[in-house]
Every structure is written in structure tokens, then in C-alpha cells.
Amino acid sequence: VKVPEPEKLAQIKAAGIDHVEVVFNYFWRNAPENECYTRAYRVKALLEEAGLKVWSCHLPFSRQLDISVPDPALREQNVALMERMIRLASIFGPQRLVLHPSSEPIADEEREIRLQNSANSIGRLALSAKEIGAVLCIENLPRTCLGRDSGELMRLIADYPEVMVCFDSNHLLKEEHAHFFEAVGNRIGTIHASDYDRKDERHWLPGEGVIDWPDFLRRLQASGYKGVFMHEVRAGVNA
């Protein structure tokens, strides 16, 4: 739901859905930062009225808002903004915070330094997440983004045992789901479930693409995951 209108939220609740993820781009994009706060409190009131609980908050992301950028001043600016958004997330009482480790494109010659930058930023933001009682979850991303496979993702969180993974099922373009589950193990803290064609991210409904969902569910259960089965699908997109 791009715009959290009362009617749409009522439909979600009527469909038997109890938990949602609040995507902070709704507050942050195309608006001055000071408007984020009033927007967030309005959404909080709408969710409470609809009887929906917030499982996770997805921190803002864009091409410019990147915690891995080489420029120290810009990186500090971006991480500081994320810290403010984490404080704002506290009004929703989320159990999980989803964070992108980078944007894109990322050139091969920059990849190493940006992995180091992202890991440092993640450690700092993990402290902010802990302050509001939430677990920071780093999302696997497609194409040239950081965290495009389990090896990179585990490297980003290796020094932070309290940080977990947000497993987006339709972002794996270079790795099989079975191998990802084996490599990440019990570090999965939340998921974004959707289907695709393995050519690019699609965010189709499960069953509309190539993912073996019975196998996916078996492996998810075997990993010890006890959280919400969070869908992240695009309305009206099937090709």
C-alpha cells in the first residue's frame, strides 16, 4: 500500500493480516525532513485505528541516501539521517528495522572500500536500533548493490552478532536460495517474500515466478525463523 488510507488498511485487516511493515520512504521522499514526523504520527494513528501491528520499519533509501559512499562528509550526513529515522521509528514499536547496505551503481574498483564503509555504518546504526529495542536487519540486494550474495552480506554483519538479515526472496540473482539459507543460517531476522524470474527483481506474488515455495518454506522453518511472513509485492505487476 503506497498511501495508507483508512479504507485500504481496513481491507488489509479484513483479509486476516495482523502485522505490517512501515516503509519510511513514504515519510521521507519528496518532503522536507521536518514533515516526516507529522506524517509518521498520522500513519501510527491510522494503523492503531485499523488494529494493525507494526512488525518492522523499513528505513529510507534512495540513490543518494547511501551509508557506503566514499565521501566521508556525505556518509556522515546519511548515517546521521538514519539515526534520526531510527528514533522516529520508535513510535511504532517495531521488532525489526530493515536497512539497505548501499544503493547503486557500484563500480568494481570501489566495491572493497564501500563494503568497509557500509560495515562501519551498520555497527553505528545497530547501537541506535538497540536503543529503541529493535533488531537491525540488513537486506540482501540485487545487481551491483552491496549484499548481493550471502558472502557479502555475512561479511557486512560479521562483527555484530546482534545484527541480522532481511532475506528478500526476489533479490537473489547470483545465488540459489538453498545456498543462501545454508550460509546465513539462523541470522535471518525478517523476510520480504515475493516471486521473480531470476533475471531481475520483480516483486510478484508468490507462485507467479520461479521460486520453489514449498522448499523455501521448509528451509525457512529449518533456519529457526519465528518471525512474520512479510510479503513485499507490487500491486498489478505480473510481467
Residue ranges and their predicted role:
Residues 1-2, 97-102, 192:
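Short, conserved structural micro-motifs that define repeat-unit consensus positions
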Residues 2-18, 48, 83, 123, ...:
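Histidine-acidic metal/acid-base catalytic patches
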Residues 7, 46-49, 63-164, 174:
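Active-site acidic/histidine proton-transfer and metal-coordination neighborhood
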Residues 20-21, 55-57, 97, 136, ...:
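Hydrophobic residues within beta-strands of alpha/beta enzymes
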Residues 22-48, 101-110:
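Glycine-rich, proline-tolerant flexible connector loops at the mouths of alpha/beta enzymes
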Residues 24-26, 60-63, 101-105, 140-144, ...:
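Active-site-proximal loop/turn and secondary-structure-junction residues that shape catalytic pockets
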Residues 32, 36-39, 71-78, 110-114, ...:
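Residue-level preference for long, well-ordered alpha-helices that form the structural scaffold
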Residues 50, 54:
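Conserved AdoMet
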